Structure formats: structure tokens, C-alpha cells
Amino acid sequence: SSYYRGGHNNFQDPYNSFWRSAMDHIEQSDGKEDAVKFDVDYRFADDSWLESARAGVRWSERDQTTRFTSYNWGVLSEIWGGGGPGGPVWMDDPVNGSPTTAGGSSTVAQTELYPFTDFMRGKVPAPTGLEARPFYGDNIAENYAGYSAFGLAVANEWGDRRDINNCPQNWVPLAQRCDVVAGTPFRPQEINPMVETTKAAYGMLRFKGDLENGWKISGNIGLRYLKTDRDTTGYIAFSRGAFPTETDCSTATTPTAFCLLTPGVRASARAFQNGALIKNDLSTSYDYWLPSLNVRAQITPSLQVRLGLSRSITPPDVGLVRNFYNVALGSNDQDIVNGRPTGTFGIGNPALKPISGNNIDGSVEWYFAPVGSLTVAVFYKELKDVLTNSTERRSFTNNGETFDFVISKPINSDEKAKIKGFEVAYQQFYDFLPKPFDGFGINANYSYIDSNGVPQNTLSSTDPDVAAGRVANIDTALLPLQGLSKHNANFAAIYEKGKVSARLAYNWRSDFLLTVRDVIVPFAPIMNEATGQLDGSLFYTVNDKVKIGVQGVNLTNEVTKTTQVLNNDLLKAGRSWFMNDRRYTFVLRASF
């Protein structure tokens, strides 16, 4: 078959493009929670410093099942081979799902030309020049069945490739993979039930009174006890082998990295990847005592001071405690270490505990006008069991064979993290101005946050994957805690007068840590660089029930930049740039 010649001298022509790959992914989770609570409240006499006492108990059971398939990428056709003489399945080829039988329906009708007009607002040349490109034209989300049927027909047209277990090696829809649960697109290891049972009890005293110097004191003191039991169901799933056979290795013109291994290692790898599924149910429990004290002192009618002491917990996201292992050896050059294939994969951690924190915060608040205030707050937090990432080399044994893998998972750090800082906030409506300017106001704040991260458990500097640059071993204790910027500033100009409401707000933050581990080689920490965004809104109240307006987001068209941290000197290099565009929304709000 010719290519890009004769009457087919442009990339817009389906003759010059082929169907290369497809991917589907399905999430279908469900859950329910049953809860029972009982509270009692007792109020003291009006002349007592004790205002009220409250106590209660609560029981809850959350039953949740996460169904989360792999990202099912697979080849449809390729330039380097196929079942027929034409190599890949070109976009103008007839397709009937058979590489050896002529005829079928043209796939041109499945394409749609996309010209990439106004690419990056015209500031960057379009990657396609002046030519459009053909792409799959149907709506995949709305017509998944059609997408699946078409992709399967193309893949079978190129060649129905199967391994020694009769499992497809080219792309097939999720539900047609080997080992799925009947009637579903999910394999057993992709279905992760979890039951969490929590028992809690608390007691709290509220108090209020006046000191001899005229200060008015109020607040509360309390204690909560919480115990959680978590039971998870999961599997250690060993992949079915997709390695070349001995015949493939002996007849290959250019042997693959796997075929260059010794025959004994090749045989061991094939035996290891036999599709075994091993049940791996896990349970964990944790309990906490959580005291708290909050005190407010009103020094004058316009000046007050607050102090808070507490211990708090933040449970891990349910996606992090999924119980699954997908163990698969690789066969490419980078997967061969010391003459043996290895693999790299991520897992959940059903034993994760909540992040716990000891918190101190205080503030001074000055209400200098009925619609004006100036506040200064300070805070300190000491965090324990901070979530971080662990990367380790671990051996797995299956079918009498043992191989090494590099696995990553979320863990609770043994190190403590600290957060300290302050915030200054000012807000005021200038109602002393002449009309109509008396509706103008300002809301502004600045916060400073100093945080130290915790080290990420990673491979040693002598590990082969680190030496080869496939895994970073940066000390993440040198970085701030995830998601925290050192400097944060917000400024909003407000107008509220009669039926008109307007707001123009600028929010800015300095750089912050997005993740301690990127999803691709070399798995380095990723920073989000300093960024600011201007938003605005204007609303008009038609009557008590109807309001109309317009909202604008990212009016300055801010570009978000991320960087990767390269070494312990915190040298950074560009990772990605995102242009989110300006967004305008016209709003009609009505109540009936």
C-alpha cells in the first residue's frame, strides 16, 4: 500500500492515517452508611458560670465497594505488521473484522476532520499546519457500545492475537478481557469492598461569665473518643503472560530484550505470570482521644481575643485504602535488571491511619465599625501520621518462581510535620461615603505558612532503578507539606447597593507541592509555581424571587505552570503548562 503520494498528498486524507490504539476505563462504585446517635443536653442556672453540658454517642457503619478498572490501553493496528499485506488498518480501509477475508464497511464514516483553528489563540503555530486531521468522530461517552464494537472490529481486522491462555493481546473492550467477573467489565481484583465501623462518644461543657475587670469570657471544653474498625477485601493478582514464545525468540530477526535473556529465566518468567489470583483480605483498627478547648475574651465591645487548643484527625481518602495488587513483569529494555525481568506498579494501603494534629490558634479581632474589622491570627500545628509515598523493592513468589518488583504505596510517615504561621485580614464597607459610593467595600487578607515536609520512603542511591534514572530519591523533607503555599494573598473589591451586587477578586499564592511522586519516570516531586487569578461577578436583583447576572473566571487568562524537582538542591525544570482560558457564565436565579 502506498503512503502520502499520488493523489494522496495531504494528511487530511484518511488514506494517510491509520487506527492505532484505543483505551477504555470504567468506574462504578456504590456505598451506603447506617448511623445512630443519641445526645443529651443539660442547661445550668442563669447565675452559673457553667452554661450547659452536652454528651452523646454515635455508631456508624459505612459499606462501600469501589469498582475501578485498569486503564485499558491496547493496540488496534500498527505500521510494523498485521494479518494482511497492508500493514495497519488505514482509515479508508474496508473493515469486516477479519484480516484474511476481503470486503467490509469503510471506516471513513467513523472519522471527523478537526482543523485546530485558533490553536493557543493563534499565538503558537498549529501542529498540523494548515491541514485538518481525521479523528474518531463519535461521542465515546454517549455511545460506548458503538466505540467498543468499532475498536474491536479494527483490532480483529489487523489480527486476532492471543497468548497461550487464549487471552487477547490486541485491544478488546474491558468486558471481553480474560478473567472478568461474569456480566461485568471488572476483574475480581478491580472490585474492592470495604466496611468501616466507627464508634464515638463525647462530652462538652459550655461556660460564660464576666470577670471583675469587665472582660466577658465564653467558650467550651470537650473530649471525644473515637474507634474505627476497617475490613477490606482484595486480591494479589498475577498477570497472564504476554511474553514471546521460544519459537518467537528463535525466529526473530531482531530479538527483543526478553528474548536476549537466558532460556531458564524466560521459562521462569512465563511460569510466574500464570494469571493466579490470591485472596488477600486485611483488617485494621485505630482509636483516638480528641480533647478541645475554645475561649473567647471580649475586652471591649469592639475588641476580643480568641484562643483554641485541640487535637483533630483527618481520615485518608477511600481511594488510598483500596486493597489491590496487580503484579506484572515487564519485558522492555528498562524492565531488565541484572539479567532478570522486573516490574513496577502502585498499590493501595488498607492499613492507613488518619492524619492527627495537635493544634493551637489564637486571634485578636478589632471591630472598629459596624461593617469593618481588622484581625490578626496566629496558628501552630504538629501533625503525626502524615500521608506520604513509599517506594520499595519487594519480591513476589508465584508458581514456584520469584521475581523482584518496585512498588509504590501511600503510607503514614514516622516523622512529625509542623505548620506555623499567621494571617492578617481586613474588611470594611465605606458607608460613610456619599451616595451611591457608600456601597463600596474591601475584603483583603494575607497569610504566611511555614511548613516542613516529611521524608518519602524511596529506594537507596545504589538501587539499579535509581542509578538508571527511572526512580528519583529526592529527600522530600526539604519540601513543604503538600498543597501549602508559604505566601497567600486575596483582595476583593465589593459593591453592594440596593439591587446591585458586584465583586472583583484577585487570589494569589506562591509555589506549592502538588505531589511527592510524579506518575511517570523519574517519579520526581512536582511543584505548582506561583499563580494568581482574577474573577468577577455582577448581579441585579429583579425582585424578591429573581436575580440575573454574569460571572467571569480567570479574567487575566492565567497560565498554570508546574515544575519537577531534580535534586536535593531543589533545582527545578519545567514540567507542564496549562492554559485554562477565560470563562463567562450568564446566570438566572429564581426561587418559587
Regions found by a protein language model. Name each.
Residues 507-519, 539-592:
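C-terminal beta-signal and adjacent terminal beta-strands/loops
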Residues 178, 188-192, 262, 266, ...:
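Surface-exposed extracellular loop regions of Gram-negative outer-membrane beta-barrel proteins
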Residues 28, 32, 44, 57-65, ...:
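Transmembrane beta-strands of outer-membrane beta-barrel pores
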Residues 43-53, 68, 97, 210-219, ...:
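Short loop/turn motifs that connect adjacent beta-strands in outer-membrane beta-barrel proteins
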Residues 379-383, 387-516, 556:
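Gram-negative outer-membrane beta-barrel transporters
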